[in-house]
Amino acid sequence: MGFLTLFHMAFLAVSLFVSGALAAFGYTTSGNNFVIDAGSANPLIFSVSKSSCDINSIRYRGTELQYSKQGSHIGSGLGKATVSVSQINGSKSKFIKVTCVTSTLTQYMIVKEADSTIYMATYITAEPAIGELRFIARLLSDKLPYEYPYGEVSTTKGSSSTVEGSDVFVVNGQTRSKFYSSTRFIDEDSHCVYGGSDLTHVCIITPQQESSSGGPFFRDIDSNNAGESTNLYNYMNSGHVQTEDRRMGLHGPYLMTFSRSGIPKLKTVDISWFGELGVTGYVPDSQRGTVIGRATGIPSGFEGVVHWYNAAAQYWVRTAPNGDFTSPKMKPGTYTMVLYQTEFKVATSTVTVSAGKTTTASIASTFNTSHTTLFKIGEYDGQPTGFRNADKFLRMHPSDSRMSSWGPLTYTVGSSSLNDFPMAVFKSVNNPVTIKFNLGSAPSQATTLRIATTLSFAGARPQVVVNGWSAPAPAAPAKIDSRGVTRGAYRGYGEVYDVAVPAGKLISGTNTITISALSGSSGATFLSPNFIFDAVELFY
């Protein structure tokens, strides 16, 4: 072999090394894949299948992060899609746009020059056949083993047994599930998986969830180290304790960002350029409206939240300390407007939003507290706050050994602590809950026992017995066909039951009330019919 041939081979090797090491914004074709290079200082290069839209390779700073046995994709993969790629010269930046089209779904993946982020949006005209809409990044667990912000509660790698279904496991004596990674929509910032000597973070950020379902307090799976792969999700809708119909249209934009300089924050995200890219269903701020106003009647110690929704979109905002609020930019339309006392619904009205206009619409709590209270257990906040195991159930199964005893428990008014009252009553575990209280004299009039709940499973509702008198059985609540508390969920329809206690049923001295989970259904232990408490109050 001649000297010149060796020289040319060496030159070619160096050239290939340099081209791989230095970022070159753009896209190329390699076999059945489009290869997109973000041209970022920390190089991000990923490959998208021309036939399925699967992301089948993600190289960040020269390290492969994509799980090889399954791609990153919408749902469980689109199967077949028409996939195209183009470069767009925007007003301030250049972009690469990948577009994947099926008969009912269009997936967009967008890269902005010099930005190690994959911006995405999903447009649908029908719910996917699998019954949920999600993006899942399947990443290498040996490269990205850790999860943020809740850590190992959703790491199911190394499980020794299954507790429930195929999604709650035991790892080192602790119950773990992907469901325990969830965060309320209103609290979402970034959720990440991370690892490596240079501490690479891969994070999902959702600037808004206007086309998702469930409202501000809905929560769903965010991440899961499942062993072979570490999975990072953006759940846009699902059947996981879902309380409203799925919304069609554009979901997003949302983004998967790659960082070696810490955890990116939502407040730093700029998507003002998104309207330049020809994304179907995208509504720019100029075609949106705003609602301003003041929420009143929220007591001190509770958070005020205003929520707007219709069949096309949903929005929310926390109120200022004085109750003032300004909505996000909203699509035009007529909305139901709800005021929450933390998560407890206290007012409902309607408002119409017009493009390019600001609408003033204040809202006041209609929750009536003008009565004489004999006792109250908990607060009307739409959560099981303070009750036994309420501090644990979001991140572990009710059967976990770290849980306090579920009972059956007896709560004595005036001497028991709030932790002596269970957050939930299960038909086959801690039925009934007993309340004991003393009255100096018997009320001469009828009283009301109000039981505020947050979520019912398998038709459970409260059956009340007062000093041996059985109250009429309430009607079954609206069915939510999903496991709840065992998956760390507590937010349902929030049924409130007012039990009319006739005069003469309460006595001077010691009184006893029992509250049982009533249901025609059955189930074993923590999958037996159950409901979650918000507050219990006796008043006249």
From Swiss-Prot:
One of its GO terms (molecular function) is carbon-oxygen lyase activity, acting on polysaccharides. It is an enzyme of class 4 (lyase). It catalyses: Endotype eliminative cleavage of L-alpha-rhamnopyranosyl-(1->4)-alpha-D-galactopyranosyluronic acid bonds of rhamnogalacturonan I domains in ramified hairy regions of pectin leaving L-rhamnopyranose at the reducing end and 4-deoxy-4,5-unsaturated D-galactopyranosyluronic acid at the non-reducing end. Glycans are attached at residues 89, 368. GO terms for biological process: cell wall organization; pectin catabolic process. Keywords: Carbohydrate metabolism, Cell wall biogenesis/degradation, Disulfide bond, Glycoprotein, Lyase, Polysaccharide degradation, Secreted, Signal. One of its GO terms (cellular component) is extracellular region. Disulfide bonds join 53-100, 192-203. It is found in: Secreted. InterPro entries: Carb-bd-like_fold, Gal_mutarotase_sf_dom, Galactose-bd-like_sf, GH-type_carb-bd, RG-lyase_II, RG-lyase_III, Rhamnogalacturonase_B, RhgB_N. The keyword Zinc does not apply. It holds the Pfam family fn3_3. Transmembrane segments: none annotated. Residues 1-23 form the signal peptide. SUPFAM superfamilies: Galactose mutarotase-like, Galactose-binding domain-like, Starch-binding domain-like. Its EC number is 4.2.2.23. Could be a pectinolytic enzyme that hydrolyzes the alpha-L-rhamnopyranosyl-(1,4)-alpha-D-galacturonopyranosyl glycosidic linkage by beta-elimination, thereby generating oligosaccharides terminating at the non-reducing end with a hex-4-enopyranosyluronic acid residue. Belongs to the polysaccharide lyase 4 family. PANTHER family: RHAMNOGALACTURONATE LYASE-RELATED. This is Putative rhamnogalacturonase. It comes from Neurospora crassa (strain ATCC 24698 / 74-OR23-1A / CBS 708.71 / DSM 1257 / FGSC 987).
